Amino acid sequence: MQVILLERVAKLGQMGDVVDVKSGYARNFLLPQSKALVASDANIAQFEAQKAQLEARNLETKQEAEALAVKLDGQQFVVIRSASDAGALYGSVTPRDAAEAATEAGFSVDKKQIALIAPIKDLGLHTVAVRLHPEVEVSINLNIARSPEEAELQASGKSIQELAAEEEAAAEFEIAELFDDLGGAASDDDDQAPASDETA
């Protein structure tokens, strides 16, 4: 099916391009979201008549997106989730969670604008792309943690695995010291034990 693009569509074309797409993609995505018109003679004439208006609207939305991009780019948002000791999440962090975290911080971001390749399934810092406009994309950082305190530690540069290793090393050190103390006490007891009379 041939359609006329009313705005830039990633991997498809620029505004005004007449492109061939699968009919399902046109009917289910491009046409309902007003991203394209069916390429008939009447629609081509209508597009040409409205082209200046569409370009002005596109420029306005792009400028709004660029203004938001300046504020949003590089921001870090904390998402609190339950996770195992190894750092694997019980569930996952989805585009909806990322959009909600950004919205709570005062940014207007929709879940459709979040570009996750795959759901996030482990604790730590994750970089996520946000497409504010077909021509404006920024990156945000999601700090996935079990608690606000853990999020602060991660933000300072420590990973959950490093923290767990430090805690484990400290516990092993305490156990080793305890055994050393017990071992020293046992050898003191051996030294103080009365010598048995071997001549009897």
Curated annotation (Swiss-Prot):
A matching Pfam family: Ribosomal_L9_N
Top-rank taxon, per record: Bacteria
Gene Ontology CC: ribonucleoprotein complex; ribosome
GO molecular function, one term: rRNA binding
Alphabetical GO biological process terms: translation
Gene3D superfamilies (UniProt xref): Ribosomal protein L9, C-terminal domain, Ribosomal protein L9, N-terminal domain
Protein name: Large ribosomal subunit protein bL9
